[in-house]
Regions:
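Short, structured patches in soluble enzyme cores that scaffold and shape functional sites
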Residues: 17-20, 59-63, 111, 147-149
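Conserved beta-sheet core of the metallophosphoesterase superfamily
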Residues: 69-132
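Divalent metal-coordination and catalytic microenvironments
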Residues: 16, 56, 92, 109, ...
Length: 218
């Protein structure tokens, strides 16, 4: 739960990390990741910002294989910026998402995967073929975030070629323009949810002990 503060050349950068509901979250009795708490997390970022020149929030949240923020995720990330964050990076969607420049801060809704070779993700080439690294140029007076596209191959991860980088960044910038419209964010997420609700229900029921027991009896 304690944030990390990095200091160099008289510049202090605070890092605040948290996660949405995951099996790895810390509890009163076990170690684990810092859980996001809508009642505490924003205030903790405010306290951190009072000690630093800049704050970076790493937020493990978002929907897998969804390239846009949900309306609620967008509200959370904007609230982090309102609380003092200069950069908010969301990590859970496992694909290159979109970028929002908001109130002087930067929000990245998904970088993609650097190295993630499990069969589940390899079978979703549309989403895992590319990713972006982030570079942050920092001075006392400026904080600039830029993207560097990379590609996953059978031999590992490499920098994208000029053509590949253009492909990744053009799609990324198009999505970044689309999310400037709040109606788009809402409607796109509704469409995504409508197409996935049946799959989620199937997976939930398929993993249910009671359903498995009934199936075995029948």
């Amino acid at each position: 739960k304690k944030p990390f503060i990095f200091e160099k050349d008289d510049i202090r950068i605070g890092f605040y990390l948290c996660t949405e509901n995951e099996f790895t979250m810390a509890t009163c009795h076990t170690m684990g990741a810092n859980p996001f708490d809508v009642l505490d997390s924003f205030d903790e970022v405010k306290v951190l910002k009072a000690q630093c020149d800049y704050v970076i929030v790493l937020y493990h949240g978002g929907k897998e294989f969804y390239r846009y923020p949900s309306p609620m995720l967008q509200r959370y990330c904007r609230k982090f910026v309102d609380s003092g964050a200069n950069l908010v990076i969301c990590q859970h969607n496992h694909c290159v998402g979109s970028r929002e420049d908001y109130q002087g801060g930067t929000i990245i809704y998904g970088q993609g995967n650097f190295i993630f070779n499990s069969d589940f993700y390899v079978n979703h080439q549309e989403f895992v073929k590319d990713a972006i690294l982030l570079t942050v140029d920092v001075t006392k007076d400026d904080f600039v975030v830029s993207e560097l596209p990379i590609r996953r191959t059978d031999n590992g991860t490499r920098l994208a070629t000029e053509v590949e980088a253009t492909e990744t960044l053009e799609a990324y910038r198009k999505r970044s323009e689309e999310i400037k419209d709040p109606h788009f964010v809402t409607q796109a997420y509704k469409a995504f949810a409508d197409t996935h609700v049946k799959r989620y229900l199937r997976e939930f029921l398929g993993r249910s002990f009671i359903v498995r027991a009934i199936n075995a009896l029948l």
